Amino acid sequence: MLFSDFKFSHCIRAVTLLGGILLSAVAQSHGRAATVSNDVRAIEFPDTASYQTLVVDLHTHSVFSDGHVWPKIRVEEALRDRLDALAITEHLEYQPHRADILHPDRNRAYDIAADAAKNSDLIVIRGSEITRDAPAGHINAVFIDDANKLIKVDKPPADTSDVLAYYSAAKEWPAQKAVEAAHAQNAFIFWNHPYWTRQAPDGIARMNKFHSANARNGVLHGIEIANGSTYSEEAFQLALDYNLTLVGVSDVHDLIDWDYKPHDGGHRPVTLVFAKAKTAAAIKEALFARRTVVWFRNLLIGREQHLQPLLAASLSASPLSYRATTYIAEVTLNNVSDADFNLRYTGDYTFMNNADRITVPAHGQIKLQIKPGKRSKKLTLPFVVENTLTAPGKHAQIEIEVAE
């Protein structure tokens, strides 16, 4: 073989290889998501004694409404955060990208995301955001069958690419009709960010006749108490007063990495769902049964009966021991969850190496040296868990029993 022939044949092989790589990259960029997760940013909480603890984000957006990424990117982010379930809930009426993406089928974002997740165990939930002015505000419906039945535009504008004109025409259909259409599909329906300052200028969530009637009639099932970078004590109290499911969401429009910086220790707000199995049906059942805890900026927010089993599963203690020739007891507290637990000791003993406030780091441990004054075979250590809320202003309390 001549040198020129040799060089030519290797060029052909290189071009063929490069072409295959490019075709693969193009196919993946528009097709299924890679099953990638990053242990540093993975959101992990243990199962409780009775249920699987599933990590869920029920409010996100893509370019099919006012988000800025393709639905596949939402799936990729969810895989990196090791979510168990994700809903891409596009605004039905507000379509700011209409000039570029006409979006006649409101199920399209779900279809793309579901296809992208096929090679993974991520559950993609079909959902939409009903978008109105107050008092209805914004409402998410998840576990729907067909998003197209939740919108009706009787008199579309002459220029259908006019975003505001289209939105004005679309919101003429009564919000109650849209909610009832979702309810007819057995959807789980929740009130989004009721403290949003564009509709509640003082930032205080207040119940109104529209939502109270739907809650009373079993048509409103949940309420966001944490959305993006915001949390509302008033919304939390409304959830307790009206027996609504606690929901926490990212409501991400840009990138999770930009908004929440998981590479720097941050995390998106999520809803921890205590389900009987890792299935869409089990998640739906748990949401209707109100078995949730919200994780927001390292704060765990939930009803006492749901938060306590999670704390019990997350925190444990080593056997009790004593330093030689002393009455100084030693015990190690272990944490298998993603939350740093900020504990305030409320018992009668004091510590050798700590004051009354102790942090048990996420997936870490801390060794305590306790001064009980004598050698006992068993000690009870009561704590207030300060990064928890079981009601506005009320923290969970635990007792850790340690024995030799």
Regions found by a protein language model. Give the residues of each.
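A metal-dependent hydrolase metal-coordination microenvironment
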Residues: 39-188, 192, 218, 225, ...
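Bacterial N-terminal signal peptides that target proteins for export
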Residues: 2-16
